[in-house]
Amino acid sequence: MTKVKMETKNLNLWYGEKQALFDINLPIYENKITALIGPSGCGKSTFLRCLNRLNDLIPNVRIEGEVLLDGKNIYDKDVDVYELRKRVGMVFQKPNPFAMSIYDNVAFGPRIHGIKDKKELDKIVEWALKKAALWDEVKDELHKNALSLSGGQQQRLCIARAIAVKPEVLLMDEPTSALDPISTLKIEELMVELAKDYTIVVVTHNMQQASRVSDYTAFFLMGKLIEFGETEQIFLNPQKKETDDYISGRFG
């Protein structure tokens, strides 16, 4: 039986007066890739940001309902948000390495969390870059500025930076939309590999990508979760007309 790692219960979100999410109930299974699909503005990125409370940073956002991580509501008053974001990491749409060396990018999180020992940091940096399939390309130039890397390399560096603090869940918001096809393929292969160790939730506009890499797919429309299921079922035998229309390209 696949374990539920995270789960949302009756999750509603407002930006000021405008409601953006409506009663979202969604399980996220451990060591699986869950893809969130739907047309622009349907709420999938807003939903993703609820999973590590990044919406807290936006003024006038109000949230009702629960987001459970291992059964505990991450919106409870006693939750340390920094600790939460260590457990639930994020990779953004546009590669956003810090303007510092490749090494310092990866060591950034571990240092914040108190690791000072050079040997230990060296180990973490090598481990994370290997996990992100970047080590062989950069091992001889770790002190080079990260901004000099190609777009695809920068995104793999951002993945290495995210996993360096050993998160349990990795959120990815359209991680390949700014990349060329070859870099995209590398990131997709990497996601499948990382799912052996992490629970991954990915927002994607690319339907082929969702069908290639994910185990489960959730289809959002106008702030509502229309359908959720195993990816193969959603793509080959959707139960809802709206899902079928979107997947077959009749709208979106």
From Swiss-Prot:
Subcellular location, record wording: Cell membrane
Family annotation (SMART domains): AAA (SM00382)
GO molecular function per UniProt: ATP binding; ATP hydrolysis activity; ATPase-coupled phosphate ion transmembrane transporter activity
Record-linked CDD domains: ABC_PstB_phosphate_transporter
Membrane topology: Peripheral membrane protein
Binding site for ATP: 38-45
Keyword Plastid: no
Enzyme Commission no: 7.3.2.1
Pfam families, sorted: ABC_tran
ABC transporter domain residues: 6-247
Function of the protein: Part of the ABC transporter complex PstSACB involved in phosphate import. Responsible for energy coupling to the transport system.
Family named by the database record: Belongs to the ABC transporter superfamily. Phosphate importer (TC 3.A.1.7) family.
Protein name: Phosphate import ATP-binding protein PstB
